[in-house]
């Protein structure tokens, strides 16, 4: 049996392993295996006698065997009286699923009792937790025990999604006769609370989630029994009566506080001195001052009453003009009154002339009038004086100098027989009143117009031709337009040159 142990070239001699000096055992390394090694059939490596263990990556951080054995080298192994434990690993076949780690004891030492030497195995992968498992292995004291530890999850992480660790020892016991006896299977459960807490630390949680969990656990422990504050209505509801008088302090002492200051203020005589006993000088001055204030208040009320009434009504012109520049404003309503009188008188003549002329189109035609035929007729007027006058004062002076050439009243015109010339003249005046704005920015002064005798014959002639009538209406309408509209339209220079010539009636 001693020769058998020497043939194992890949065995690891176990020395006194302390808890402080623990190394990481890389089981994934290639372990050279001798060809003369006694292995079962079908368990040799296929690639040049080397065994590749890619299927098992177990970083063993702490593995401590304390059977009180001191083994330093092969020479000391032969001289020692204690058993030699050799750890050797063999790969599995394709059909096999169990890896064995066997601790073999030489047959020279037969009196060694395994029960007295417990095996303490540290197999935790997590760096923060250390779980110790103390187990006395080997119920058969006189037999060599190759002991195999089975790790079903060989992925390098034994605590991933597992709350319990099962360590099963599927081992066989070889006796001197070569018989194999099954060793009892045993399970290890780590029920430590510290291990369970470290499982949660290894889970995939970010720092924010961990802080949130700690805060939630903190708030669950805190019991806040806050009661709402009861608001007491200390202030009483304010109910104001319609005839309630506020308790103002009295300025006067009690005998004089009963005086009716309003009535005494209206009466100019000093009756309060007669009714009341003579008071002190300070009180007398105070009473006189209060009476003056009452009179002043009464006067202001009377003065402000008409102003309050005028604000609700339309504003009326109550003051006279202070200068001559304001005279057009005074004369403007007179013109408006005369125009308002012309409107009802002209309406009657308008109804008679509807059959002979298109009176509905007069306003449109007046805006589209062509000034090419404007010089055929002469009229008795002074348009140049109106054009040259730029101020309302000059307009009023020219209007006052020619009072005879003003327009006749519509009532006198309607008193004549209803001839065509009179009806046309009334229609011209009616359209001129429509063209007048109600509130023009400049004072409106109608241009004086007198038709010559020859014009009547010319107006009678175009009865047969309806088109020439419209042209005559256009001319008459434009002649009697107000000055403000004529100024905007800007008369042509040819018409201005013809206006300089005066009619024979005006020369007389």
Swiss-Prot record:
It comes from the Eukaryota. It holds the Pfam family FAM217. InterPro entries: FAM217 (IPR029266). PANTHER family: PROTEIN FAM217A, SI:CH211-266K22.6. Belongs to the FAM217 family. This is Protein FAM217A. It comes from Homo sapiens.
